Amino acid sequence: MDMKVVPWRLKEDFLYLMSCFYNEGQEGIPDLAALFRGVEIIQAWSTRGRIPHSVESTSQLVSSLISNDRSQKLALAVSISRFVSGLLDPIQQSQYAIPMAVLAKSIDLPTYFVELRHAITHEELPSLPVLRQAAQRALSWLYDHYWNPAATAESEDTYDYTETNELHKFEIKRKVKDLLKQWRSWRKVNVSANMFLPVEEHDYIQQFEALVQELVTTANLRLPYIPASFVDDEKDLDFAIETTNLDIVVSCFLEKRVLIPSRTMPISFFPKLKNVWLPLLQSIASKHSFFLPALFTTLWSEILEISQTVDSLVFLDLKEKEELTDKESAGCYLAKWYAYLMREAYTGQPWTSTLSVTQTDLASVLEICLQRSDPFTKIIIDELSILDKELENKFSPLFQYRSDMFDSRILDEQEFEDITLEQMKTELNKFSVRLNNIEAQADSSTMEFQGHVWYKPSVEPSPIGQIIES
């Protein structure tokens, strides 16, 4: 059996590339971003070795079709000519030259392409509409005679690259856990030691720097197998997470005995936990530009996932609850770490320079938290609502309402029976007064136009041309 070396490692890579150029069943045209992505992947693969002619031709034809510059006509002519020559020249093996039309019939290539190639080479270039139509017909021919047969052929590749990655991740995770265990054991004994002194002053500083460098180096190492969908995005966070050990290192930090206590602990223990791990986080963040953004993003995903497991109809005040479950305790500490990192980044602390948090980001987080009723997002609101005065004023009625809901309790049937009609009226009057206050405040500071509420700025009248100090 003939074996050929190809630039993709797995059939899934080939299928992903095919999906960039062709929709399933060739129905419609893929979006422009997918076409560009396919061209980029082939360009990256070309650095690995020879690209099959049909794959390279597809890339050239697509590039010519999506080009908008003045040279599109010439680009289409060249790509069509190469498409025909690349198919027919390799089978021209006779001692005497065989007409191209005959060779074309042997591979079921319409003679239309041969005639068009002859016109491009020896006559005046055909018009742009003719070339565009020819390029599209060439792509259809390539789908029928190369891409679809290759995609549906039985794969003889028995090597499981996914399993290789999983074994690699297991080994890396064990290594990272050992390094974090070393740090935890030493830091608990030397909890007050300054870890940012010059390296030459203390031996423990040298050991600390060596441990940090080992973690950073490990995080930067590539996975054994990188999917085709992650080619040529070197400066992208998603690329770093999907193709290196960064995701493994970050996940190790979010386990028990690291950023989460080994057993259920009250939230008041957080300052002590922070004192243990903050120097290590700060040092890694200064040496790995993606570490802090990856940790921040993963924390948020974990918090949202845990919050979905809490019954939205039950409001828990964790400060008064006698015993927390493991999941509740973990969720609280993840929320505390997330709020701490966001506060540090929002206030511009130097060690968080790789993590950008704008007012829009802060507002988005607060809005999402306000839509949830779990105790973890309440922690985030309590920590972050005071960071920005403008946002605090904007959301204050919602903050107050949510706080009141958390202070309330779900009553059983017996407790409902004990409530008198007068008590219910008093409670209703209280809410009415609050609603009137909110409406009065809205009337004085907002106006409605075409269904939208606009906040009116409080600006004193002044003569035209006079500078108003804000």
UniProtKB/Swiss-Prot annotation:
Subunit structure: Interacts with crb3, gcr3 and eix1.
UniProt keyword Transcription, yes or no: yes
Record Pfam families: Las1
Family (UniProt): Belongs to the LAS1 family.
Function: Required for both pre-rRNA processing and heterochromatic gene silencing.
Family annotation (InterPro entries): Las1
Top-level lineage group: Eukaryota
Any one GO molecular function term: endonuclease activity
GO CC aspect terms: heterochromatin; Las1 complex; nuclear envelope; nucleus; rixosome complex; spindle pole
Main location: nucleus
Organism of derivation: Schizosaccharomyces pombe (strain 972 / ATCC 24843)
Localisation per UniProt entry: Nucleus; Chromosome; Cytoplasm, Cytoskeleton, Spindle pole
Entry keyword set: Chromosome, Cytoplasm, Cytoskeleton, Nucleus, rRNA processing, Transcription, Transcription regulation
The protein, known as: Pre-rRNA-processing protein las1
UniProt record, GO biological process: cleavage in ITS2 between 5.8S rRNA and LSU-rRNA of tricistronic rRNA transcript (SSU-rRNA, 5.8S rRNA, LSU-rRNA); maturation of 5.8S rRNA; maturation of LSU-rRNA; rRNA processing
Gene designation per UniProt: las1
